[in-house]
Regions:
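N-terminal leader/targeting and assembly helices and adjacent pre-domain segments
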Residues: 1-145, 153-154, 201-205
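Acidic, glycine-rich two-metal-ion catalytic cores of nucleic acid-processing enzymes
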Residues: 122-205
Length: 205
């Protein structure tokens, strides 16, 4: 289903463009202070706070729009509490908690900048890692808001649909077309997996 992640890709594009500008501005600000260590710590602290705020804002919009776009859907679209709980929970696919990971990335970026002469390279590396995490969690927000829409409307089973584009992994191929209870769907086999779910009438025996 080529359109399943259209909203996701729009959200990722918005966030990537914001992140590029924020990292560039942070790099320029740090350079003006000649990459003073304390200044780098302050610049990266502010940078990652702003990045996390951007993601929270756009992830919530994505979740709410995806919920309404999903058919069938209920009458309780995701709210901020829903999103914060999702981001604070341990994720079996990424193997970490988003709310802790962005802080770890902040600290790692600041440490890397302060411990090397290739400071611009470390800003770029930080951007790359942030963009990857943002993409993974945009997909997760899409999946979970879709499943919430199904559950709120009484859907009990879903079918696993693989992309079938020649790039899917062996696990995704093996799960293609399988029916799962909506509360017992196996975790996706890798971060960013774009297999998707559709309502199913009943479980196949």
């Amino acid at each position: 289903m080529s359109g399943f992640y259209d909203l996701t890709d729009k959200a990722i594009d918005i966030l990537n463009r914001r992140a590029v500008k924020r990292f560039e501005d942070a790099k320029d600000e740090a350079a003006l202070a000649k990459f003073d260590e304390l200044n780098v710590l302050e610049v990266t602290r502010t940078l990652y706070q702003d990045l996390a705020h951007d993601n929270q804002e756009i992830f919530l919009e994505l979740a709410q729009e995806r919920y309404q776009e999903t058919e069938p859907h209920g009458k309780e679209p995701p709210d901020l509490a829903w999103l914060l709980a999702l981001l604070a929970a341990y994720n079996a696919v990424t193997k970490y908690q988003y709310s802790h990971e962005w802080e770890r990335k902040r600290d790692r970026t600041a440490e890397a900048i302060n411990s090397t002469t290739a400071k611009v390279t470390e800003f770029r590396r930080g951007l790359s890692y942030w963009a990857q995490m943002t993409e993974w969690y945009a997909v997760e927000v899409t999946d979970q808001s879709t499943l919430k829409a199904f559950q709120d409307s009484g859907v009990r089973y879903v079918k696993w649909n693989a992309m079938n584009d020649g790039r899917e992994c062996s696990t995704c191929k093996e799960r293609e077309g399988k029916i799962y209870p909506i509360r017992s769907i196996p975790p996706k086999p890798h971060p960013g997996c774009r297999c998707w779910y559709t309502p199913a009438e009943k479980k196949r025996i």
